[in-house]
UniProtKB/Swiss-Prot annotation:
Residues holding NAD(+): 16-17, 155
Name by which UniProt lists this protein: dTDP-4-dehydro-6-deoxyglucose reductase
Influence of temperature on activity: Optimum temperature is 15-37 degrees Celsius. Active over a broad range of temperatures, from 4 to 80 degrees Celsius.
SUPFAM superfamilies for the chain: NAD(P)-binding Rossmann-fold domains (SSF51735)
InterPro entries linked: Epimerase_deHydtase, NAD(P)-bd_dom_sf
């Protein structure tokens, strides 16, 4: 497939990852359509013959099936990148039924409707940080899936259904198990993203509450590296359909806080620490498959990535 000749649909185009992806794809002159429940952010390129925006929620795909068919046909949509979700990880624990309905069932309907209306390939943004559980060794794509929260379980179920539907309807699918993305364009006053949240709280002397062990490790990926992983996935024609996408490195929460303290020249205020959760295990992703199959590799190390994010915030 030549992505330059076929249209690409992105859901969740107004989000952090969506905006970065759209900017890259418009620059490459790839015909592009974005679905989002919000209007197009002013920070994105102007709409054009090659960049279209629809206020359309994937939750409504069955109710608006005729409109979906017309959009897919009009823009020759052959590939869909599904970023949109209705749930943050921390919210899913108290909203299991809503999570299942909106982030499993609605996805199944959306995928089926897309394949049946001419789409050939769906790339799904899964979660490398929540589908595996925790360990002190890197997770490969073939390891057992042991999600500990509903958010991770819904990702696992969606991956499985996507693979099944693609096979049944002669389509292709890719699930990218993404670590913790961060970088330029990310809100630091939001509810998502450890690095921007820590930057905001340390900058403003707001206490940081630690849930779990402060020695637990996480994998963080800079947004430009993540965008390139999606671009490689657009062109990929191989047989693998699941890829871990991370930095290949990990850092403890304690070390991350110390790093940000040094860069801001401010001490963090540590508030609540959960004394029950003392397990220092965390999430480290083995990214060798993505490097070998997609021809992709991360290029931004964490220290430089945090510098880039801080600089972008100060330039606003």
């Amino acid at each position: 497939m030549d992505a330059r000749k076929n249209g690409v649909l992105i859901t969740g185009g107004a989000g952090f990852i969506g905006k970065a992806l759209i900017t890259e794809m418009v620059e490459r002159q790839i015909p592009l359509v974005s679905f989002d429940i919000s209007d197009k952010p002013d920070s994105l390129p102007e709409l054009s013959e090659y960049f279209n925006w629809y206020k359309f929620s994937y939750l409504e795909s069955s109710q608006r099936i005729k409109e979906l068919h017309e959009i897919v046909s009009r823009h020759n949509i052959k590939t869909v990148i599904h970023l949109a979700t209705t749930m943050f990880p921390h919210e899913s624990k108290k909203n299991i039924d809503k999570d299942c309905l909106e982030n499993v069932y609605a996805n199944v309907c959306f995928f089926k409707n897309l394949y049946e209306n001419g789409c050939e390939k769906i790339i799904f943004a899964s979660s490398g940080g929540t589908v595996y559980g925790k360990s002190d060794t890197p997770f490969s794509e073939d390891d057992a899936l042991l999600p500990e929260i509903s958010y991770g379980l819904s990702k696992v179920m969606t991956e499985t259904y996507l693979r099944f539907i693609a096979k049944e309807l002669n389509g292709k699918s890719i699930s990218l198990r993404i670590s913790n993305p961060y970088g330029e364009g990310q809100r630091i006053d939001g509810k998502q993203g450890v690095i921007p949240i820590f930057l905001n709280k340390i900058s403003n002397d707001i206490p940081i509450d630690i849930i779990g062990s402060i020695e637990s490790k996480r994998d963080y990926i800079y947004i430009s590296d993540l965008v390139q992983a999606f671009m490689c996935s657009l062109e990929y024609e191989g047989h693998e359909d699941i890829f871990n996408i991370g930095s290949g490195e990990s850092i403890t929460l304690k070390k991350l806080i110390e790093t940000i303290e040094f860069k801001l020249n401010k001490k963090a205020v540590i508030g609540f620490q959960d004394p029950i959760h003392t397990n220092a295990n965390g999430i480290i992703l083995d990214i060798k498959r993505a490097m070998a199959e997609l021809g992709w590799r991360p290029t931004v190390v964490l220290d430089d990535g945090i510098d880039k994010l801080i600089k972008s915030i100060r330039c606003k």
